């Protein structure tokens, strides 16, 4: 009886905990000439780390797909999105990303080809928008940080290195204090165990006075690359988690 067009907005708000704003995203695509959509709602601001964390995400599509194609699409979509964000490096036991399809758009069942590619692109776009909202809403965060690592031996090592920097308390507090201490980035990369020659590293960072901070590292060891998103570590984060129960 509570179903309505505005129900999705109420659902966004109902699942919030320490979030400061509700999170929703929608993307559209075409299936055999018919308009279809992917819509998602999520919550999460703290205990956010790869392999998810204390976050909930519910994604819906009115396209028709079977369990196999849905699972494959979701696995692909979360890899560069939800599994490449971290607020504090802490995970929880109650994380979830759920994808449901009802076929209500009236097009035929999608199993592959161009329509499946279009669906996968729309799904990843929704996952990315929701994931980045979580980082921007990180508990106590004053900065949104993008860490791009290129030139690694492979993509896995690039992601490992980027995550090591993103989860470094020394790096995160330096960004909060607008302190360009790049030694903390190099130290985090070295401690991550990935292979590179420190003498070949190239490092660039945007202004730390801005809300959005971009960090770029080239390791000079190969062609692997990854991007991880995080936030700074502030006194407000400590206050929130010291008082939360």
Question: At which residue positions do the language-model features occur?
Answer:
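A structural signal for small-residue-enriched, beta-sheet-centric alpha/beta enzyme cores
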Residues: 1-245
């Amino acid at each position: 009886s509570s179903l309505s067009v505005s129900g999705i907005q109420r659902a966004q708000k109902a699942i919030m905990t320490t979030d400061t704003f509700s999170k929703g995203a929608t993307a559209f695509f075409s299936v055999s000439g018919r308009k279809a959509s992917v819509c998602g709602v999520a919550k999460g601001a703290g205990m956010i780390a790869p392999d998810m964390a204390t976050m909930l995400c519910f994604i819906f599509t009115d396209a028709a797909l079977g369990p196999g194609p849905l699972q494959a699409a979701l696995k692909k979509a979360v890899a560069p999105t939800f599994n490449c964000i971290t607020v504090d490096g802490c995970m929880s036991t109650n994380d979830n990303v759920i994808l449901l399809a009802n076929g209500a758009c009236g097009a035929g069942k999608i199993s592959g080809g161009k329509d499946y590619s279009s669906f996968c692109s729309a799904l990843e776009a929704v996952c990315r928008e929701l994931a980045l909202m979580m980082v921007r809403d990180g508990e106590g965060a004053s900065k949104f940080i993008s860490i791009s690592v290129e030139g690694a031996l492979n993509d896995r090592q690039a992601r490992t290195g980027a995550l090591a920097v993103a989860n470094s308390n020394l790096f995160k507090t330096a960004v909060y204090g607008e302190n360009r201490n790049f030694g903390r980035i190099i130290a985090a990369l070295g401690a991550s165990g990935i292979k590179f020659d420190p003498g070949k590293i190239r490092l660039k960072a945007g202004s730390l006075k801005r809300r959005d901070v971009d960090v770029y590292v080239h390791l000079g060891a190969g062609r692997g690359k990854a991007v991880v998103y995080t936030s700074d570590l502030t006194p407000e984060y400590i206050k929130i988690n010291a008082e939360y129960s």
